[in-house]
Amino acid sequence: MGDIEKGKKIFVQKCSQCHTVEKGGKHKTGPNLNGLFGRKTGQAEGFSYTDANKNKGITWGEDTLMEYLENPKKYIPGTKMIFAGIKKKSERADLIAYLKDATSK
């Protein structure tokens, strides 16, 4: 898969203003991502999701994140996430490798 260290840099630059990853981390504009892998969309406790996100019904994993992170609004029309996406597959792979590591601690 990707490079965790490169993924961490991408997370800090593109994601950390809205998301946290650590266990017990606060929700910001976006939900805390701890425990993301294996969780269904719209399920982080205490975060107010759109119906579109709650009703998508997919389980987050490498494949679903690879598609979602390319174009979030295309993957979940109606999501609140204002991020345009990451076009480079290698950058998405790095970010996913980091998220897989950082959200499981």
UniProtKB/Swiss-Prot annotation:
Binding residue positions for heme c: C15, C18, H19, M81
Keyword Glycoprotein: no
Stored InterPro entries: Cyt_c-like_dom, Cyt_c-like_dom_sf, Cyt_c_1A/1B
Compartments, as annotated in UniProt: Mitochondrion intermembrane space
Residue list for modification N-acetylglycine: G2
Alphabetical UniProt keywords: Acetylation, Electron transport, Heme, Iron, Metal-binding, Mitochondrion, Respiratory chain, Transport
One Gene Ontology CC term in the entry: mitochondrial intermembrane space
GO molecular function: electron transfer activity; heme binding; metal ion binding
SUPFAM superfamilies reported in the protein's UniProt record: Cytochrome c
Keyword Isomerase: no
PTM section of the record: Binds 1 heme c group covalently per subunit.
Record's function text: Electron carrier protein. The oxidized form of the cytochrome c heme group can accept an electron from the heme group of the cytochrome c1 subunit of cytochrome reductase. Cytochrome c then transfers this electron to the cytochrome oxidase complex, the final protein carrier in the mitochondrial electron-transport chain.
Family: Belongs to the cytochrome c family.
Record-given protein name: Cytochrome c
Organism: Dromaius novaehollandiae (Emu)
Lineage, uppermost ranks: Eukaryota, Metazoa, Chordata, Craniata, Vertebrata
Name of the gene: CYC
